[in-house]
């Protein structure tokens, strides 16, 4: 391989690592590995900032239900705000929109108000953020600025990267009530109409206009 070709290959890899990959469901490595609870030494956000954010508590998740094929990975992640740690593979009983984001990710910042509007308009669908390798105080400050009140968990060590096969953020998963991932959006969502349409198409829930 010539130096020029090697440089082009390296540049393409860096581009993919810096932003979401092409739209599509892709393949997930889920439902087959042993349960994991990543360790973290990251300090939680300040209590006064959490009080200002008024985040909903993280949802309860079933610790005993077996993971499903093509479901969320069997990872237990700490809550960014109040509430228990969340076992992703144990989220059942309601459709979920799960958004991987970070305060350092520019397209993620643009998406958050869209998810906040969906959360306010559609109680039949639960939203959960996964804040990736972020400063918790910066993350909560962004949620305040974006009007987000739905909960997020913290992925301080990028534990979701291998099972969900993501190369960049944001990434959004549409998960049915039985825990099966119906669709993975690997590119930024750029409009409310696009997000609402994805919810209606893959979760079967009509979003009020």
For each predicted feature, which ranges?
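Soluble periplasmic/extracytoplasmic beta-strand elements of cell-envelope proteins
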Residues: 76-78, 129, 173, 183-184
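Residue-level recognition of short loop/turn positions
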Residues: 18, 81-82, 178
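Structural microenvironment flanking redox-active thiols in thiol-disulfide oxidoreductases
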Residues: 109-146, 156-162
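Hydrophobic alpha-helical membrane segments, chiefly transmembrane helices and signal peptide h-regions
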Residues: 6-18, 100, 114, 130-132, ...
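Thiol/disulfide oxidoreductase modules built on the thioredoxin-like
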Residues: 141-148, 155-209
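N-terminal targeting signals for export/organelle localization
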Residues: 1-78
């Amino acid at each position: 391989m010539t130096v020029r070709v090697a440089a082009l290959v390296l540049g393409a890899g860096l581009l993919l690592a810096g932003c979401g990959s092409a739209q599509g469901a892709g393949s997930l490595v889920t439902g087959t590995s042993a349960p994991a609870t990543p360790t973290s030494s990251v300090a939680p956000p300040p209590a006064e900032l959490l009080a200002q954010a008024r985040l909903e508590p993280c949802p309860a998740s079933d610790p005993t239900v077996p993971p499903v094929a093509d479901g969320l990975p069997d990872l237990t992640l700490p809550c960014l705000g109040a509430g228990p740690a969340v076992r992703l593979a144990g989220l059942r009983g309601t459709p979920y929109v799960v958004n991987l984001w970070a305060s350092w990710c520019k397209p993620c910042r643009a998406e958050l108000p869209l998810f906040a509007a969906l959360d306010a308009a559609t109680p039949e669908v639960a939203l959960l953020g996964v804040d990736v390798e972020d400063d918790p105080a910066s993350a909560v400050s962004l949620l305040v600025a974006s009007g987000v009140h739905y909960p997020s968990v913290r992925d301080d060590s990028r534990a979701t990267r291998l099972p969900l096969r993501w190369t960049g953020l944001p990434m959004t998963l549409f998960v049915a009530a039985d825990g099966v991932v119906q669709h993975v959006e690997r590119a930024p969502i750029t409009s409310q109409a696009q997000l609402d349409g994805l919810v209606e198409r893959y979760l079967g829930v009509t979003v009020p206009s």
